[in-house]
Design a protein with these regions (language model features):
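Non-cysteine beta-strand/loop elements that form the S-adenosyl-L-methionine
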Residues: 136
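Portal/gating segments that form or line small-molecule/metal binding sites
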Residues: 1-129, 139-179
Length: 179
């Protein structure tokens, strides 16, 4: 069975919003290699609407390097408001999301990766559908912005499965739901 693996940039105070404004000073080759390794284990992406729209605007119609990878990767978009997902290789998921995600996990292939989409990550985690949570914790207090766990929906125990630190102070933490 395929796993759903989410990778997120998070500040020390839990902010995940607009990482492009606060990760720069800490992003080095080590962090880039960690991100690359996470992406290499995936052959599809699961995205929420907001992340999908941002990625489609950034990469759709572009070519070369990361744009080719993003455009060619199958993307599954969870949304209750979109009526279509027109970016290349995108499929809309609406209605019974849990059932459709379970079906995706049954298909052959490598991991289904997630980048951003913190609302969807939270929902999947709380519904037992997220298999791996990789957090790249940046040594900065942002102060304001959307937080990874901002909804008081109860406790979800996790098990630390790996950790590594980088020379810029970034720490990569890998978790799975506790058994």
């Amino acid at each position: 069975m395929r796993k759903i693996a989410a990778g997120l940039f998070v500040s020390l105070d839990g902010v995940v919003e607009a990482p492009e404004t606060w990760t720069g000073p800490y992003f080095n080759d080590q962090v880039g290699q960690a991100v690359g390794a996470m992406m290499a284990s995936n052959d599809a992406m699961l995205l929420g609407r907001t992340t999908y729209e941002g990625f489609a605007a950034a990469f759709g119609g572009q070519s070369g390097g990361m744009a080719d990878q993003m455009n060619n990767t199958p993307k599954f978009v969870v949304s209750s408001t979109l009526t279509s997902a027109d970016w290349q290789n995108s499929t809309l998921i609406s209605g019974n999301v849990a059932e459709q995600v379970r079906e995706l996990k049954q298909r052959p292939g490598r991991n289904i990766g997630m980048s951003g989409s913190s609302t969807l990550v939270n929902w999947l985690l709380r519904h037992g559908l997220l298999d791996q949570l990789d957090l790249l914790v940046f040594p900065v207090v942002v102060g304001a912005g959307k937080r990874l766990f901002s909804e008081p929906d109860g406790r979800v125990p996790l098990t630390l499965t790996g950790s590594e630190s980088f020379s810029t102070g970034v720490v990569h933490l890998s978790y799975q739901p506790a058994a």
